[in-house]
Design a protein with these regions (language model features):
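Short hydrophobic/Thr-rich beta-strand motif most characteristic of the beta2 strand and flanking loop
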Residues: 27-34, 42
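C-terminal output helix
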Residues: 108-118
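Active-site beta3 strand of CheY-like receiver
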Residues: 46-52
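Short, glycine/charged-rich "phosphate-handling" switch motifs in NTP-dependent
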Residues: 101
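The feature encodes the CheY-like receiver
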Residues: 58-59, 76, 88, 106-107
Length: 121
């Protein structure tokens, strides 16, 4: 399935702005959420083709949200790429075990992220 609409979940407005600009320039439609509650509202409202998920957020962390999304049949087929400052291998492995399709560490390399998105779609 081609990817055209991407949900970015990150509590940092700076990261949201960076990713939104990058993806819009790449031709993607973008919606954003700053926490888990907003993410689930956006999922229900907009049904994105891909989710970029931060890990360190208030309330539910990105690992928990990723697990909820990837285990829920109504969101089947929506891939999640974790985008986080957590660089430990144990975090990367845990993220993949929660159902993430890929794991990108911050600071994000724009061309690498775009290549990963294209590879999924």
């Amino acid at each position: 399935m081609p990817i055209s609409k991407i949900l970015i979940v990150d509590d940092s407005r700076t990261e949201l702005a960076f990713l939104r600009d990058l993806l819009q320039k790449g031709g993607y439609t973008v919606c954003t959420a700053e926490n888990a509650d907003e993410a689930f509202r956006q999922l229900a409202q907009d049904r994105p083709d891909l989710i970029l998920m931060d890990v360190v957020m208030p309330g539910q962390n990105g690992f928990q949200v990723t697990r909820s999304i990837t285990r829920d049949p109504q969101y089947e087929g929506i891939p999640v790429i974790i985008c986080t400052s957590k660089t430990q291998e144990t975090d990367r492995v845990w993220g993949m075990r929660q159902g993430a399709r890929d794991y990108v560490t911050k600071p994000i390399d724009a061309q690498d992220l775009l290549a990963k998105i294209r590879a999924l779609g």
